[in-house]
């Protein structure tokens, strides 16, 4: 029987794929997911969401389909506040044995 070597990944599949901006992409996807959940729960059309978020409808479409190139983390956070969400950023020292990272919880 042949043994197959397994390589342990991280908790970020985008980093495991070697993407240089994996943490930012993951953060954007998490924020977009929260925005999409709110849009769906409120039954908003893309047009209605665009008015509420004060962004063009094509940007809402991009968020809805997770095509987040050209949409900043700041813009996503502003969208969440426009939807009545509190966005909090906490900076704290990391443990000695753990590399520093960006983490988003939504």
Short names for language-model regions:
Residues 1-33, 94-104:
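N-terminal flexible/basic segments that precede or flank functional cores
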Residues 39-41:
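Short amphipathic helical patch at the helix-1/turn junction of helix-turn-helix
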Residues 43-61:
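Short alpha-helical DNA-recognition segment
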Residues 57, 68, 97-98:
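Short secondary-structure boundary/hinge segments and terminal tails
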Residues 64:
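DNA major-groove recognition helix of helix-turn-helix
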Residues 67-73:
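Short, solvent-exposed alpha-helical "recognition" segments
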Residues 73-90:
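DNA major-groove recognition helix of helix-turn-helix/homeodomain DNA-binding modules
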């Amino acid at each position: 029987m042949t043994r197959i070597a397994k390589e342990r990944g991280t908790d970020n599949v985008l980093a495991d794929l070697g993407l240089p901006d994996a943490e930012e992409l993951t953060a954007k996807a998490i924020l977009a997911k929260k925005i999409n959940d709110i849009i769906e729960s409120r039954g908003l059309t893309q047009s209605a969401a665009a008015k509420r978020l004060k962004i063009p409808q094509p940007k809402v479409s991009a968020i809805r389909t997770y095509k987040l190139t050209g949409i900043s983390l700041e813009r996503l956070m502003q969208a969440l506040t426009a939807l009545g969400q509190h966005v909090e950023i906490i900076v704290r020292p990391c443990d000695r044995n753990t590399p520093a990272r960006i983490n988003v919880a939504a």
